[in-house]
Amino acid sequence: FIIICFCLVNLSQKSEVLALTYSENHNFVSSAAKNVGPAVVKIDTERLVERQQFDPTLIDPLLRDLLGEQGIAPERERGQGSGVIINEQGLVLTNAHVVEKVDNVSVTLANGNICDGRVLGTDPVTDLALVKIEESNYSSFAPLGNSEDLEVGDWAIALGTPYGLEKTVTLGIVSSLHRDINSLGFSDKRLDLIQTDAAINPGNSGGPLINSNGEVIGINTLVRSGPGAGLGFAIP
């Protein structure tokens, strides 16, 4: 009877340890997302683009002279991406291709507030950009990790606003490191990328890739889709 009781107690203790271990492993994604989520923003952009409404060579010269420039009307071209606040002054790190050559930038914070954004600079070679939001002393900013410490197989969590869906979190692993962007068909870039199987979709561009400690280890930049699951890539 004593031996049976001891075995039952021992099994119970092991079950508690296993349950605790599972709980801790199960919740690291939630903890990491809560740590960085308040610093993730949606970026909406707008630029005026002149589009020719007709081919002037196909119109009678007299009518063309009468219309003048009326056949060319500016249109508003809208874009959308993600970003992450990296300090309390409201500096947002994002992709250059999200905000370059735009006329207006609007930043939606995690709390729903919408701020005007000002592009401080873009680097098309590394596809990175800095945007300043006009809200001082913003307390929610993401801690930066060290991508040099990454190993293949480490957890990778992608945050952003794919297709405009805010506060989206996906989980995967680091599938490869130092992936040459030229091998993906971008000869004008100089990057070696983090490859991940965490789901990255249009609108995720500029959002953070974070580790299990809730630190930013990369900026999501592109996805290569095809048969089966897509491949995601982030700038370390």
Model-found features: residue ranges?
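Bacterial N-terminal signal peptides
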Residues: 2-10
